[in-house]
Amino acid sequence: MPYYEHVFLARQDASAQQVEELTTQITGVIEGLGGKVTKTESWGVRSLTYRIQKNRKAHFVLLNIDGPATIVAEVERQERINEDIIRYLTVRVDELEEGPSAMMRKADRDRERDERGGPREGGFRSERGPRRPREEETTASVEE
């Protein structure tokens, strides 16, 4: 059977519990039609690049699906009807990715960095050592 990666965006107003219920509902549709959901990832609330139906943020959810194309058609039909889902995208892939997705790896990488992009190590002036004497002081002591 073909493999699909399916991402849907739920309204920002929806609670995390409602998004979980949407995910369970979609998973039920997939399994009811003979498919299988191999991975489910919730990426949380993220900012959108542009407004979609007056929303600036949305809950992002990824599903990896193993099943025929009729499942994808039914899932997308259900999502068009649902008012809480503002956008969805399904892509057919040759094989499903094992482990965390690129977005989850990026979130882990962002947590390891500070606001300037460097590692979270050291403190104030930790690597520089003490100051060198200024040129004025050394030339003044030589002239005397």
From Swiss-Prot:
Molecular function terms from GO: small ribosomal subunit rRNA binding; structural constituent of ribosome
Entry keywords, A to Z: Ribonucleoprotein, Ribosomal protein, RNA-binding, rRNA-binding
General function of this protein: Binds together with bS18 to 16S ribosomal RNA.
Family designation: Belongs to the bacterial ribosomal protein bS6 family.
Biased composition (Basic and acidic residues): 105-137
GO terms (BP aspect): translation
Species for this entry: Afipia carboxidovorans (strain ATCC 49405 / DSM 1227 / KCTC 32145 / OM5) (Oligotropha carboxidovorans)
Keyword presence, Ribonucleoprotein: yes
Protein name, entry field: Small ribosomal subunit protein bS6
One annotated Gene Ontology cellular component of this protein: cytosolic small ribosomal subunit
Region (Disordered): 97-144
Superkingdom, natural source: Bacteria
Pfam families hit by this protein: Ribosomal_S6
Gene3D superfamilies: 3.30.70.60
Ribosomal protein is among the record's keywords: yes
